[in-house]
Amino acid sequence: MGTVVQLKNRINNSYSELKNSVEEKLVLVEEKIKLKLSSKVSLVDEMTSYHLRTGGKRLRALLTLGTAKICEYSKGGRDINLAACVELIHAATLMHDDVIDKSKIRRGKKTLNSIWGNQSSILVGDYLLSRCFEMMVEDGNLEILKLLSSTSAEISQGEVLQLQHKGEIDMLEETYLKIISAKTASLFAAATKVGSILANKENKIKEALEFYGKNLGLTFQIADDTLDYNSELKFFGKKIGNDF
């Protein structure tokens, strides 16, 4: 357990360094997300505003901004738009995930489904995904559109696979890794690869960053699941054992 906590601390330290390096752009990502989530339906506005107030590290958005920076992307604000897009995919999966798991608490606060019910939460999650795809089409890069579309499909398949094996105490390591690779690591991998695509880097750099993102995502989820297995609600911010 101590090793996992140390690993989480190392990730948090690296996160702080990354955030500091792109902090100005992250502010613009937040503004872009708020703008894109604006709706003519008052309940949608109410629910998305609540979700934004619950916070979040914006880690996947930071990975897109960070990789775009190290790949020397400097033309316009496409990195900001696509970082917002990646974050919207993540937010939508959380909303759907909370409904599936019947979660009442996330980040120490009530989930959308515990306040507004399952139907509204699912539809608002779908709304986020539709806004995300709208942004991808506006960006106009088919490679990015294909990457994030296939990633969204992979996340859904990972969630279904997890449901299929939920509660299995004797789950094979291979099955567990397949689940977290799809539902978590795939979006980390996409977030890091997008930055290199924006900068028109050669395939070996794209593949290297994608590989890095995937392994970071696996590490993150393994640490998160270990804490889920052996932690306390007041420290973890959500119901313990929900992912098992």
Stretches with model-predicted labels:
Residues 18, 22-25, 29, 82-85, ...:
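Amphipathic alpha-helix face/heptad-repeat signature
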Residues 119, 151, 155-159:
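Mid-bilayer segments of alpha-helical transmembrane spans in multi-pass integral membrane proteins
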Residues 63, 132, 158:
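Residue-level signal for inorganic ion chemistry
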Residues 79-103, 153-154, 185, 189, ...:
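Active-site alpha-helical segments that house and flank conserved acidic catalytic motifs
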Residues 70-75, 135-147, 162-179, 191-209, ...:
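Inter-helical turn/loop segments and adjacent helix faces that build the functional surface
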Residues 106-128, 170-184, 207, 211, ...:
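Divalent-cation-assisted or electrostatically stabilized phosphate/pyrophosphate-binding catalytic cores
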